[in-house]
Amino acid sequence: MTSILGDDSGSRLYWEFLDTGLAESAGMGSYDHLGCGGIMTYLCCSPENAQANMERLKALQQKIFDEGVTQKELDLAKRKIASRIVLASERTNTRMFSIGSQWLSGQKFKTVAQIAEIYESMTLAQVNEAIKAFPLDNSMTVVVGPKNDLQAV
């Protein structure tokens, strides 16, 4: 989901904010832990664009909740993720970290191919169900910068 919505290239945040020049950077990432986790969305822009961009982000989150993501977006995300997994597995420290993490969390060891297959097996319905189960507008907003008059959206 975060690859579709907030990846650094080709995501919805990219097209909404970076490609248009409304922000210097924007992205979304997931932080998963055993049994819990979170999603962080960040947006870096000029103070003059801050309020309008927060409103654009809110509208984008609502559109994602209402309409879900498309099969084309999911297919692209699967290819990106599989490529990242394979490329990262070429580094020894990444392979060792993966083995250690799986062992510490009590999981059976999975090969790179097995991990990639988990992502490949995700369906559009599953992704859209996750979006409904964990709405992006259920969040806290933190603002860093010179603006002290921003209104919550």
Q: How should these model regions be labeled?
A:
Residues D7-S9, G27-A88:
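M16/insulysin-pitrilysin zinc metalloprotease superfamily fold
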